Design a protein with these regions (language model features):
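Membrane-interface "cap" regions at the ends of multi-pass membrane proteins
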Residues: 1-64, 213-216
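Loop-to-helix junctions at membrane interfaces in multi-pass transport proteins
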Residues: 2-5, 40-49, 66-81, 113, ...
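Transmembrane helix-loop junctions in multipass membrane proteins, especially transporters and channels
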Residues: 25-33, 97-106, 158, 218, ...
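Membrane-helix interface/capping residues of multi-pass secondary transporters
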Residues: 35, 76, 217-218, 226
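Alpha-helical transmembrane segments of multipass membrane proteins
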Residues: 12, 16-23, 60, 89, ...
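Helix-loop-helix module between adjacent transmembrane segments
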Residues: 20, 79-214, 275-281
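Membrane-embedded alpha-helical segments of transport systems
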Residues: 54-63, 71, 84-92, 131-140, ...
Length: 281
């Protein structure tokens, strides 16, 4: 079942985990000095590091799946919507960030209290805490973690690596919960084996992230983000070059799209619409 993790992939994975853990430990003492050091890196973070960290955060596990899905259902034109993030971040950086820094606050909730004060501020903080902390973050984490599980499923085969009785105990647990966490869904004959394997993969991912975030604070997060964006950018470029090479070049790629979607793709989209940079054509 699934694919095998190559030696190079294993080295990259192990090296990054070791780096992330070491970054958390390295920045632990500095981050533990006070809240500003922990949450804001002492307000000394260079702009380029902050920018790369934001880019890495936007480029999550779900990003390739999302972009591919948008192109398949709405065409290249559908990607224009992502310009809103560029405009928003420029607005934040050049218009609002200065005022936030002068306010001397540490968190968004504190800014709300300083800006409004009194009972209205308390109500607003409560609403924002529930909406952003529970609804928005819950939805965001759900799709990112599910995307991570879909990507990890063919490669992280815990059922082949762990002792049988130990892994079976995890299978029994997820079976009792009854919530499938697999690409195939409930109809897959190995649904609970794959769900158990994906559950262990997510535990490992969350454990590493929680460790370096909790110990290193913002400095630890940014340091790992910079390495992540470098790996993702290089990997994406290498994958794109490989795909174009395999189909015979950019011209052949266009021909393959017309051949594959001659009678329409998802939702009836036509080849010309998939390749369109403007609505319709």
């Amino acid at each position: 079942r699934g694919a095998h993790v190559s030696f190079v992939d294993a080295i990259i994975l192990i090296a990054f985990i070791a780096y992330a853990v070491s970054v958390g430990l390295w920045n632990r003492q500095q981050a533990s000095k006070n809240l500003e050091e922990y949450f804001l890196a002492g307000r000394s973070l260079p702009g380029w590091k902050a920018g790369l960290s934001m880019a890495a955060t936007q480029f999550a596990a779900d990003t390739p799946l999302l972009v591919t899905g948008i192109i398949a259902t709405a065409g290249i034109f559908g990607l224009w919507q992502f310009w809103i993030f560029g405009i928003t971040f420029l607005l934040l950086g050049f218009v609002l960030a200065g005022a936030w820094r002068r306010a001397g606050v540490v968190t968004d909730a504190e800014l709300t209290e300083v800006r409004y004060g009194g009972t209205p501020a308390a109500v607003l903080r409560g609403v924002k805490a529930f909406y952003f902390g529970t609804v928005i973050n819950g939805i965001s984490l759900a799709w990112v973690l599910f995307a991570a599980a879909k990507i990890a499923e063919p490669f992280l085969l815990w059922d082949q690596w762990l002792p049988g009785p130990l892994f079976q105990s995890v299978v029994n647990m997820v079976d009792a919960v009854g919530v499938p966490l697999t690409v195939g869904g409930i109809g897959d004959p190995e649904v609970w084996v794959k769900t158990a394997s994906n559950f262990l993969s997510l535990l490992m991912i969350l454990g590493v992230v929680a460790f370096y975030s909790a110990t290193g604070g913002l400095r630890g997060v940014v340091a790992t983000d910079i390495v992540q964006i470098a790996i993702m950018a290089l990997g994406t470029f290498a994958f794109a070059v490989t795909v174009v090479w395999e189909v015979g070049g950019l011209g052949s790629m266009t021909e393959r799209i017309y051949e594959t979607f001659t009678f329409g793709g998802p939702g009836g989209i036509l080849p010309g619409e998939i390749l369109a940079f403007t609505p319709g054509h």
